[in-house]
Amino acid sequence: MGLEYDIEVMKFPPRFTQPGYTDINPIGTVPFFTDGHVEMTESAGISQYLASKYGPTDLAVGLDEPDYGLYLNWLHRSDATLTFPQTLVLRYTILEPEEKRLPSVAADYAKWFHARLRSVEEATADREFLCAGRFTIADIAVGYALYLADTLRLSEGFKPNTIAYYERLKARPGFQRATRFDSAQMV
């Protein structure tokens, strides 16, 4: 969209590693987005907000387009269905102290993630992007879920269509800009 922005990368999880972060964001989660007096913490909501407020943009699917419902479903599936189980894998394999790690919980949620990932495999069998015949913020959101999976080594379970879709996303200049930061800083 060509918007100017400032990004601050913090060691994860910032509520424990960044003094004063909960004074700014009481729930202590990332992302935390501000636009004037607007403060938001939900990734999909932030994307939807930006596309709606600063559009029109082809990154959004309009209410009058046939794939509008599909677009919203993918946009919100990214966090609620695809990213959520990965947060438990992250917690119980990396973030918790060694004595509190639960490999069986992590393994169960990794299986859950891979089962939910079938929807991406099916959706990308006959199309380049998830909806509306073009790249949208739904692809950005699902792309993050795939990126997190790759970071957690869950990408070993990706099927052929998902692999090809993820490769298309990674080839985009915006993806490359967004992932310039050392992933070790972010996780």
Language-model segments: which ranges?
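GST-like domain detector, emphasizing the conserved glutathione-binding G-site
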Residues: M1-S104
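Conserved beta-strand edge residues that scaffold enzyme active sites
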Residues: K11-P14, A138, S183-A184
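Phosphate-coordinating loops and pocket residues in cytosolic domains that bind phosphorylated ligands
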Residues: D23, A171, R180
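Active-site-flanking alpha-helical
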Residues: A51, A145-L146, T179
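GST-like fold's C-terminal all-alpha helical module
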Residues: L75-P173
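Terminal-tail/helix-coil boundary detector
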Residues: F175-V187
